[in-house]
C-alpha cells in the first residue's frame, strides 16, 4: 500500500510540475499558478445525488459541466507550496435540496498527508476548513489521475445536511486530475 501511495504521490507531483530538474531560488518555494484541477463525480454518486433531488452548482469562478455521463467541475489553481506539498484552489461547489444546502470552497490538495480539505458551511453551520477526501490510487484512469474517497467528517456532513444515510467514510466520491499548465 505504501508503494502504491508513493506512486500516486509522484504521479501527482509530476503532473503539477512540483518535481523538476534543476534548483530554484528560495522565493520559488511558494508560487502563484495558473491552471485548474478537474474533479469528476463518480457515476454512482452522481446518480445518487440527482436521484435524491440534490442540485450541484459551481461557486466563485468554478465551472461545472456534463462529462462522460456524470458531472465534472474545474477549480482554479491559485498557488502551490513546495515546502508543504500543497496545491491551493479558489472556487467551490454547492449542493442544494430544498432548504438544505452545503457549500464546499477553497480546496487544498495536501499531497504530504494524502488529503483534500475545504471550507464547509451551510445548513450544518459554518464548519471552517476540514478534511473532505482521502487521495487514493485511481481505479478509473479515464475519469481521473487519483480517486477521492470521503472522510468520516465529509460523509457525516452530507448525511446530516440532506437527512440521508447514503454517504460513508472511504466510499468513492469522485476522481481528480490537476492540470496546472492548462487554461482555465
Where are these regions (language model features)?
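Generic alpha-helical propensity signal that fires on short helical segments
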Residues: 19, 23-24, 120-122, 166
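Predominantly extracellular/secreted and cell-surface proteins with exposed
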Residues: 59-128
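Secretory targeting and sorting signals
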Residues: 1-27
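N-terminal segment immediately downstream of the Sec signal-peptide cleavage site
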Residues: 27-82, 145-184
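Extended amphipathic ligand-handling, pore-lining, and cofactor/metal-binding catalytic surfaces
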Residues: 119-120, 125-156
